[in-house]
């Protein structure tokens, strides 16, 4: 369904010109039968509020938590991103949450950031040569356009494990004056357009749930189960949260409003 994907991305980030659209020509068509699976879902997990909320709503051994660290904005020059420190931090995060949710887990590393995409050049060409000027493009640009494609480096694993349903925690923002405004690379229209080999995204978790309510749900779920988890929300690409950026501050306030101390949830 490449034409559908292209049309949807054009609607959000474009309009794109028809001649920009690539194509895939199959020389041979063969039947692909997905193997039987003991799993129901892949739940994408970054450690943030949206991802943890998706995890607590889909716990247990029938679900596989999948983390793709390169979806996050990472500066190539920093050791915690190009070396083992950053990867080890992500492994620890998903391993600890898998113990909380009692799900299996998988961490996928790729070379998209380091070797495949020259992000600065692509962003510049899209703006100056292709003249993209949509509201969504100015909001998150090439980072948003590549987001789901990068996330779908998990696709071969999903197929090999026989998993047909992909679950993504929604980052949709509820804005009363413009309720359907969602200028993010994880826009539900974009994820809904992606279908391949019997695999597709399910309805995004928490699509119409406010962030403050998600944090409250996480706290209540953990307290009911007698468990605790870290929540990773920092804008910084360091292995430690700064606790002073916008995302850190608002998450800590959400935790306080839920009656908890942020220190016990990965802050400070």
Briefly describe each language-model feature range.
Residues 1-41, 49-268:
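Nucleotide-activated chemistry modules centered on ATP-dependent adenylation/adenylyltransferase
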